[in-house]
Amino acid sequence: MITLDALNEYDALTVWKSHLAGVIEENPFMQKDLDNIKTDPKAFQRLFEQVTNRWISGEHDRESAPRWKDFKARVTKGLRTIMDGHGPGSEIAVVTSAGTISVVMQQSLGLSDKKTLELSWQILNSSVTRFRYNGDRIALSGFNDISHLDATGNSDFLTYR
């Protein structure tokens, strides 16, 4: 087993702290969601979507905060390290998070940043996504498979965060 920091999730807490005030300033009506964040899970999701949309736009980048383009570059480098180290046809398991998976999906499907972010909201914890690599490109071969969780009969295992 090896560990590649390049495939770690983005620092969501720092992204949140870096962009939340701007989201509220640009959308004052969202203050209500912030006020209800501890009692309404949907309020958090609405705010977090706005925070991450602001983040991926790149229009509010600061040196002191993570940048979307840097996250994508890091994941791409990590993916390249795996592909170069194992070659086409190898079977490799990578355990990571929705943000990282969505960036690889973006590369394999040619998605925009916005669609990539939207896709990331659909990725279930512990789901399995499969890719194939032929030496030139990476292609999606399965997405968000939860059959191993369904087999337990316990829907409590189906979570998004």
Region spans (language model):
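Surface-exposed cleft-lining segments at the edges of enzyme active sites
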Residues: I56-D70
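Glycine-rich phosphate-binding loop signature in dinucleotide/nucleotide-binding domains
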Residues: I82-S90
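Phosphate-coordination/substrate-recognition cap region in phosphate-metabolizing enzymes
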Residues: M1-E49
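Short aromatic-enriched loop/helix-cap "lid" or pocket-rim segments at secondary-structure transitions
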Residues: A12-S18, Q107, T152-S155
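Beta-strand elements within well-structured catalytic alpha/beta cores of enzymes
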Residues: S90-T96
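Conserved histidine-centered catalytic loops in small-molecule metabolism enzymes
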Residues: M1-A6, K32, F44, F48, ...
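Domain-level recognition of soluble alpha/beta enzyme cores
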Residues: I2, S112-R137
